[in-house]
């Protein structure tokens, strides 16, 4: 992802965008 939210791709590793 990454298109829907700034941390969409990061959420795969870190969980929901904090």
Curated annotation (Swiss-Prot):
GO terms for biological process: neuropeptide signaling pathway. Its main location: secreted. Found in the abdominal ganglia and perisympathetic organs. Not detected in the thoracic ganglia, subesophageal ganglion, corpora cardiaca, corpora allata, hypocerebral ganglion or frontal ganglion. Belongs to the pyrokinin family. Keywords: Amidation, Neuropeptide, Secreted. It is found in: Secreted. This is Pyrokinin. GO terms for cellular component: extracellular region. Myoactive. Coiled coil: none annotated. The modification Valine amide is found at residue 18.
């Amino acid at each position: 992802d990454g298109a829907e939210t700034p941390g969409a791709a990061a959420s795969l590793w870190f969980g929901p965008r904090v």
